[in-house]
Amino acid sequence: MIDKKKIAEAFGKAAANYDNFSVIQRIAGNILLSKIETFFNISILDAGCGTGWFSKKWRQLGNTVTALDFSKNMLLTAKNTNSADYYLHADMEQLPICDNIFDLSWSNLSLQWCNKFNKAISELCRVTKPGGMVVFSTIAHGSLYEFNKAYRTINSSYQENKFLSINDIKLSCCNKKTLIDNILITFSFSKILEAMYSFKKIGANYISSNHSKILTKKKIRQLQENWPYNPNGYLLSYRFVFGVIYL
């Protein structure tokens, strides 16, 4: 089971510098934006808003935005940058919101931290008006393959995070009319520590919380020998899934 308190702590620690390292979130969010039309003057829920990067984008278009996050520090960062109209510290699996409130519910790379993906999707559908949409991006099984492969060579007890399969994500979508798309994006880094640092600094170090915190020179060399590599550097892949649910 996912420990949401630890996740909130991990993202909270990353909040101050999150926007300097959140290239992955922005790439996924921009792809998600391309899946739908641009909306103006509607009510939007940004569920798992982080620092409010996309909340601010939606608000600048004249929309009324509610920014929601489970991390108080992330929400405070969003508030300090005036990203939204309203701010709500809450769990996506138990939204303290009445039915049929928002025209659009948006969640970018947050649902993978829920214990019950289908419950979170159901909640987003519940608070969205009939005729509205729930749009989301998430990470699917197969992500971080390179890290998992290499790390098991220095820690045989390491257990990777179990991201849902694409099919399981499809089955979680409330039996509604849904468009699902996915893409594998591979990033490259000049050093393996940079690759690991990239997901640590966006709060996602929780996924590797069961590995030892001290990497000796010997272990680093072993990681280098086993981490997939090409002329561009050490590789780290994410399987992104994008969903649009029509209500």
Curated annotation (Swiss-Prot):
The keyword S-adenosyl-L-methionine applies. Its EC number is 2.1.1.197. It comes from the Bacteria. One of its GO terms (molecular function) is carboxyl-O-methyltransferase activity. Keywords: Biotin biosynthesis, Methyltransferase, S-adenosyl-L-methionine, Transferase. Pfam families: Methyltransf_11. Pathway: Cofactor biosynthesis; biotin biosynthesis. The keyword Methyltransferase applies. It catalyses: malonyl-[ACP] + S-adenosyl-L-methionine = malonyl-[ACP] methyl ester + S-adenosyl-L-homocysteine. One of its GO terms (biological process) is biotin biosynthetic process. InterPro entries: BioC, Methyltransf_11, SAM-dependent_MTases_sf. It is an enzyme of class 2 (transferase). Converts the free carboxyl group of a malonyl-thioester to its methyl ester by transfer of a methyl group from S-adenosyl-L-methionine (SAM). It allows to synthesize pimeloyl-ACP via the fatty acid synthetic pathway. Belongs to the methyltransferase superfamily. This is Malonyl-[acyl-carrier protein] O-methyltransferase. The gene is bioC.
